Amino acid sequence: MARYIFVTGGVVSSLGKGLSSASLAYLLQSRGYKVRIRKLDPYLNVDPGTMSPFQHGEVFVTDDGAETDLDLGHYERFSGVSAKKSDNITTGKIYSDVLRKERKGEYLGKTVQVIPHITDRIKQFIKHDSSKEDFVICEIGGIVGDIESLPFVEAIRQFANDVGKKNALFIHLTLVPYLKASDEIKTKPTQHSVKELRSIGIQPDIIICRSERPIPLDHRKKISLFCNVDIKNVIETVDVRTIYEAPMSFFKEKLDLQVLNYFKLKSKKPANLNPWKKITKIILHNKKQVNIAIIGKYVELKDAYKSLDEALTHGGIDNKVKVNLVRIDSEKLKISEIKKKLKNISGILIPGGFGKRGTDGKIEAIKHARLNKIPFLGICYGMQMAIIEFARNQLNLKNATSSEFDKKGLPIIGLINEWTKDGKKIKGTDKDLGGTMRLGSYDAKLKDNSKISKIYKSKLIKERHRHRYEVNIAFKDKFEKKGMIFSGLSPDNKLPEIIELKNHPWFIGVQFHPEFKSRPLAPHPLFSSFIKAAKNHK
């Protein structure tokens, strides 16, 4: 039977519940246990797929096509276990399921209520497909006290009673702030947060205290006394220089051992933190550096490209070089400033995106990379912009465009049901935004002796997609005659998945999102190759 660990947050949000959960998962795995991590999000959206990146950050896509919270990216990168649709649930999804059943009459005329119908559905989600796991870690989004999170907190309280307290552990992550003016660390916010949690019926078993400074023993004793938690279970987590130090920080505090002690379990093997020590050393102490420009319209919010940032870091780890990310807002990028802004850049990356805003800046940056032989990687929308730039400037198709933002031009890029084999437009169908995506993992076959096949060292790959628009295969021959090779296609040869320039040191565009599959201990080959090219660029 699986044992369940529930991670809640208090005082403020964005304290690092996801990273803490992911770090704990790795530590338990390193002790010989199977672990799965799940996220319970209290917002009313069915999923984050249609939410603005400024509101929610990155949308992380799983192999089976779920649009999920970015924390699932942390889970995968730290644990090495691929997430599933069943690992992320939202209030919107829960209510949709319950209301659908009500409309079908499955509740036999009963009054549908938060308790028991909503809470029962949450408990079903927690327990689903968990029988083969040793531990299931469930992170509850938001903080204790939020109105939105109340059904989830009530559900996990009930769940602990259902499975027995010996099979359920509550971890509460709180902020222990440092006041510079008085040079003091304050424990009162943590005390009040735990008081709030206890008022709902949950007594935390472990408290993780996030602070920018080490917490004195007297303060930890105070938290132990007022929150009714053993002093050994008051865990300190001080701000680290890189997130990859987090597992080592929790290992030092013996978080994993305290969890095993609670469940009366022993370590199956010694924990091995050497891989993490190695990569943090490369990140923090490597003198060799490369500057990579990320040109997009969501660069103001770091979380908007979280997996991408991490994948580039992984590429740096593999090449033993520090990667400096230079974020450039494509909406504000003027043609006259491109040369100046990209002067000391060793590689240019255009990430995924949607809509017309910022397209001109992206296209001009791609042109600069192509003409000046600067290593270039275009991801999803970035590949489509590279196609448009090449069509306009090399194929002389001046009206080449995407039907996503221009319905009058030549649709080099369009919805798959908007064009036919001869490239002519046909009428598409209107659907909900959330239901028209090509989502999840798909196969692609690679061209023999192409740059991309040498990078992957394979003829067939499987990568994750998240897009509505595709490159029109009807233009393939025209592009290849001018030197842009369609080096990756869908197995049926209908959908271009990868393009590369013949007469360029490193110019690749991919329709998928390779960043979702990169991990610190197993960097994605595409990012390793890109950083290597940037490292060698002069």
Curated annotation (Swiss-Prot):
Residues 291-538 form the Glutamine amidotransferase type-1 domain. UTP binds at residues 13, 186-191, 222. L-glutamine binds at residues 353, 381-384, 404, 468. Pathway: Pyrimidine metabolism; CTP biosynthesis via de novo pathway; CTP from UDP: step 2/2. Residues 1-265 are annotated as: Amidoligase domain. Allosterically activated by GTP, when glutamine is the substrate; GTP has no effect on the reaction when ammonia is the substrate. The allosteric effector GTP functions by stabilizing the protein conformation that binds the tetrahedral intermediate(s) formed during glutamine hydrolysis. Inhibited by the product CTP, via allosteric rather than competitive inhibition. CTP binds at residues 13, 146-148, 186-191, 222. GO terms for molecular function: ATP binding; CTP synthase activity; glutaminase activity; identical protein binding; metal ion binding. The active site is at residues 380, 513, 515. ATP binds at residues 14-19, 71. Pfam families: CTP_synth_N, GATase. The keyword Manganese does not apply. Its EC number is 6.3.4.2. GO terms for cellular component: cytosol. It is an enzyme of class 6 (ligase). GO terms for biological process: 'de novo' CTP biosynthetic process; pyrimidine nucleobase biosynthetic process. Keywords: ATP-binding, Glutamine amidotransferase, Ligase, Magnesium, Metal-binding, Nucleotide-binding, Pyrimidine biosynthesis. Mg(2+) binds at residues 71, 139. It catalyses: UTP + L-glutamine + ATP + H2O = CTP + L-glutamate + ADP + phosphate + 2 H(+); L-glutamine + H2O = L-glutamate + NH4(+); UTP + NH4(+) + ATP = CTP + ADP + phosphate + 2 H(+). CTPSs have evolved a hybrid strategy for distinguishing between UTP and CTP. The overlapping regions of the product feedback inhibitory and substrate sites recognize a common feature in both compounds, the triphosphate moiety. To differentiate isosteric substrate and product pyrimidine rings, an additional pocket far from the expected kinase/ligase catalytic site, specifically recognizes the cytosine and ribose portions of the product inhibitor. Homotetramer. Catalyzes the ATP-dependent amination of UTP to CTP with either L-glutamine or ammonia as the source of nitrogen. Regulates intracellular CTP levels through interactions with the four ribonucleotide triphosphates. PANTHER family: CTP SYNTHASE, CTP SYNTHASE-RELATED. This is CTP synthase. It comes from Pelagibacter ubique (strain HTCC1062).
